[in-house]
Amino acid sequence: MEEFQGYLELDRSQQHDFLYPLIFREYIYALAHDRGLNRSVLLDNVGYDKKSSLLIIKRLISRMYQQNHFLISVNDSNQNRFLGYNKNLYSQMISEVFAVIVEIPFSLRLVSSLEETEIVKSYNLRSIHSIFPFFEDKFPHLNYASDVLIPYPIHLEILVQNLRYCVKDPSSLHLLRLFLHEYYNWNSLITPQKSIFAKSNPRLFLLLYNSYVCEYESILLFLRNQSNHLRLTSSGIFFERICFYEKIKYPVEEVLANDFPATLWFFKDPFMQYVRYRGKSILASKETPLLMNKWKYYLVNFWQCNFYVWSQPGRIHINQLSKHSLDFLGYLSSIRPNISVVRSQLLENSFLMDNAMKKLDTLVPIIPMIGSLAKVKFCNTLGHPISKSTWADSSDSDIIDRFVRIGGNLFHYYSGSSKKKSLYRIKYILRLSCVKTLARKHKSTVRTFLKRLGPKLLDEFFTEEEQIFSLLFPRASSILKRFYRGRIWYLDILCINDLVNHE
C-alpha cells in the first residue's frame, strides 16, 4: 500500500489529481495482477496469470495511445477495433486495471478515516458468521420479516453514475463508460446467468455493484434515521397539531380518546432491523404487517424513482417468523419456542411453571445441499454416493485430501447448525464417494478395497472435527460429545465458495 501511495503521489503532482492517466502506467497493471491494493480479497484469480507479460502490457498501452481505436464504428459494430484479436485477454486486463483505479478514492478515504479515528482493524467483523449472533440477539424479539432481493440495475450507466460522487475525474468515468459500452452487452438486462458475480472479470463488477448498493443503503439509512428521529419527537407537537385542527368541531376529551392515539401511531415508524449479504437483504420488525407493507411499497417506489429499476411488490414476501423459515447465507433460520419447566416452592405448596422463550433455530438445507453435491458428481439426485470419475487419475493421498478438505469446509461453515443429523448425512455421502473413487481407480469393489486397506483409511474424516474442538476445549470424549450438539460460530469465514471451486 505504501508503494502504491508513492506512485499515486507522483502522478497526482503531474496530473492534478486526474485518475485517467493511470491507465497508461505499467505499474498499475502489475498492481492489478498481484492484487496489491487489497490482498485480503478472497476472489479466484481467473485472470491472466500465465499469459501476462511486460510485452503484452506495452502492446496494450500503445494501442490505447492511438486515438482511432477509441472511436466506435456504427457500421462495423461487430468488429472489435480496440482490442483486436486478443479481445478476451485485453478485456480482462483493462477490467482489472479499471477496478484498481476506481478503488483508489475509496481506499484512500478508508485509510484516512482509520487514521483519524484510530480504529484497530478487526478482520473478525468481516466474517460471514458474525451475522448469526446478531440474529440470535435481535430476531427472537421480532415478529415479521421480509426477504428482499435487491434488483439489478437494468442499465450499466446507472452503475457508472453512482461513481461520480467519489471519482471526481470525468475522463476516467467517460473511459469506463466507453469500455463497458463497446465490450459488454450494454443495453441488456443483467440476468442471473450473467450476473455481476460471474467468474469472468469479477473485481470491476463487484466494485460497481457495491457502489450501487452503498448508495441505496445510504439513502435508506438516512430515511430510517429520520423516521427514528420523528419517533422520538415529543408527543406534545402532535397533540397541539390535532387540537389546532379539531378543537372547533370536537371537545378536547374526544380528541384525546380517539384521534390522538391513532395519529401518534401513524407517525411512529417501527424500529427496523436490516441485514444484507450480496444481493439479498432481510427487513425485520416487531410491528404489525400493515407497517411492513408500507415499507414494502416504499422500497418499490424508492427503486423506481431513484434508480429507475422496476420491481414487483409481489416478489417481496412478508412472513411471520414463528411460522416461516428464512433462507439466508445457506441456513434455514426460524424462531421456535423453547419451553423450560421451572418448579417453584411456596411455603408448603409447590407448583410447576412453563417458561416459554423464543430461540433462533438454524438448520442445514439438506435438499439444496444434496443438489449441489449431485451437480458436481459426488452423488445422484436422490443422494446416493457415486464415484468422482474426474479425480480417478490423481494419487490416493490427493483424492483423500480433496474429499477431506471439502468435508472439513462444510463442517466448518455449518458448525452453527442446531441439528447435526443432516450434516452427518452429507459427510456420509462424501466418505462413500471417496471410497468409490479410490475403488474405481484401483479397479476393485468397495468391499474388497476396504478389506484390503482397513478402516483406518478414512480416519481423517473423523479426526477433522476433533482437531478443531481440541483448540477450544480439553480433549475429553464427554466434552466433545456435548459440544458436537451445540453450535459454534467461527469469525474467520470471509467468503462462500461453491463446490465447483474445488474442481
From Swiss-Prot:
Assigned keywords, A-Z: Chloroplast, mRNA processing, Plastid, RNA-binding, tRNA processing
Membrane-spanning segments: none
Gene that encodes it: matK
Top-level taxon of the source organism: Eukaryota
Compartments where found: Plastid, Chloroplast
GO biological process terms held by the UniProt record: mRNA processing; RNA splicing; tRNA processing
Protein name stated in the entry: Maturase K
InterPro entries (UniProt xref): Domain_X, Maturase_MatK, Maturase_MatK_N
Family of this protein: Belongs to the intron maturase 2 family. MatK subfamily.
Function (record text): Usually encoded in the trnK tRNA gene intron. Probably assists in splicing its own and other chloroplast group II introns.
Pfam family of the protein (one): Intron_maturas2
